[in-house]
């Protein structure tokens, strides 16, 4: 089972994935029959304007790769649920790629680190099974441990081509004449394509090959590959690269020691960090306990405050009622005070008493006058009737 390169960013895995798709002749066997353009690295690490279409195209590519491994998967469409597409893809890949650390929601986006690592893992599985004929290193920088022979690095003529597995169909150089390809045997052919119909693994178009040459030419500082290798066998460069690789392999010892020292230093730093983390965790535990006590105290005070607020509300209501009653009593008291201070009735009584006193005096005078008149009148004679 292949472990996906989840630690690498998508932009790095995408470049490796495009190269592996070329080795699998993806453009010829998958893109052209389905009227699709060739895959570029940006298709895997950049978000497109339609994420669902991007997910569907990537899923279909994975299905084609799985079909190369003899695994049949149900097709997908733009109307399927993205989570369902991601889940089905992970289930189909679980026997060849370790998908334990790849969640479906990281696949449903249609791009990113996890999806690129998954597709790259499937491509690695295809290459491991199909084993295409490519130039590969059998023991890069090794010291011929199997042979037990120590070769002199200063001898430029030493035969070291046995460190390479070379497919003769892929060994060849371009001549200065456009459209001519020279094989290792020195035979010039009229076309850049080999018997398999490919210029290089995954390339069947001469225009694409020229674009590759221009890209490599710009990376090599403007050297024209066609002019340099015209009519020449580039195995000498492979030999030089092999010598350079062996020279570099000797430096790996010191590098390994430096790396070992760095690992030791990193280990010590990690131990310090772990100790500091434990100390901080203990402090966090103490402060967490204090925070819990403070929260409980705050909760109790909050409850008391709520009860006091209710009591204050009740007392405020009672106070309002008492104020209303006091206001009514004050109004009644003012009315009674006004009524008690009113002297109009007393004035009427006094006036009545004064008028009665005058009438009494008049009556007394009249009575006196009447008595006087009575006493002044002579009594009548007997037997005299006064009519």
From Swiss-Prot:
Its main location: other. Transmembrane segments: none annotated. One of its GO terms (biological process) is intraciliary transport involved in cilium assembly. GO terms for cellular component: 9+2 motile cilium; axoneme; ciliary basal body; ciliary pocket collar; ciliary tip; cilium; Golgi apparatus; intraciliary transport particle B. Disulfide bonds: none annotated. It comes from the Eukaryota. Keywords: Cell projection, Cilium, Cilium biogenesis/degradation, Cytoplasm, Cytoskeleton, Flagellum. It is found in: Cell projection, Cilium, Flagellum; Cytoplasm, Cytoskeleton, Flagellum axoneme; Cytoplasm, Cytoskeleton, Flagellum basal body. The keyword Isomerase does not apply. Belongs to the IFT57 family. Component of the intraflagellar transport complex B (IFT-B) involved in flagellar assembly. This is Intraflagellar transport protein 57.
């Amino acid at each position: 089972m292949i472990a996906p390169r989840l630690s690498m960013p998508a932009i790095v895995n995408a470049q490796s994935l495009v190269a592996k798709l070329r080795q699998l002749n993806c453009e010829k066997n998958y893109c052209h029959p389905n009227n699709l353009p060739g895959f570029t690295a940006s298709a895997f690490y950049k978000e497109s304007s339609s994420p669902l279409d991007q997910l569907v195209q990537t899923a279909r590519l994975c299905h084609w790769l799985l079909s190369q491994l003899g695994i049949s998967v149900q097709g997908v469409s733009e109307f399927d649920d993205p989570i369902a597409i991601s889940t089905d893809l992970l289930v189909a890949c679980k026997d060849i790629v370790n998908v334990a650390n790849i969640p479906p929601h990281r696949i449903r986006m249609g791009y990113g680190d996890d999806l690129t690592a998954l597709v790259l893992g499937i491509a690695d599985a295809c290459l491991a099974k199909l084993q295409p004929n490519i130039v590969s290193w059998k023991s890069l920088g090794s010291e011929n441990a199997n042979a037990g022979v120590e070769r002199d690095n200063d001898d430029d003529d030493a035969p070291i081509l046995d460190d390479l597995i070379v497919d003769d169909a892929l060994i060849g150089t371009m001549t200065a004449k456009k459209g001519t390809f020279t094989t290792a045997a020195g035979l010039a052919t009229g076309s850049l394509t080999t018997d398999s119909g490919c210029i290089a693994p995954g390339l069947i178009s001469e225009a694409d090959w020229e674009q590759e040459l221009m890209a490599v030419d710009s990376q090599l500082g403007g050297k024209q590959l066609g002019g340099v290798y015209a009519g020449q066998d580039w195995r000498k460069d492979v030999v030089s690269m092999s010598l350079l690789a062996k020279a570099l392999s000797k430096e790996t010892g010191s590098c390994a020691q430096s790396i070992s020292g760095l690992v030791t230093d990193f280990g010590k730093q990690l131990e310090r960090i772990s100790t500091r983390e434990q100390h901080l965790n203990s402090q966090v535990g103490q402060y967490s306990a204090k925070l819990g006590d403070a929260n409980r105290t705050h909760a109790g005070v909050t409850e008391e405050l709520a009860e006091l607020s209710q009591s204050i509300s009740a007392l405020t209501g009672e106070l309002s009622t008492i104020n209303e009653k006091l206001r009514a009593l004050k109004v009644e008291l003012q009315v009674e005070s006004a009524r008690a201070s009113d002297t109009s009735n007393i004035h009427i009584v006094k006036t009545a008493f004064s008028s009665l006193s005058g009438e009494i005096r008049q009556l007394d005078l009249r009575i006196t006058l009447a008595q006087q008149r009575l006493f002044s009148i002579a009594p009548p004679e007997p037997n005299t009737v006064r009519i």
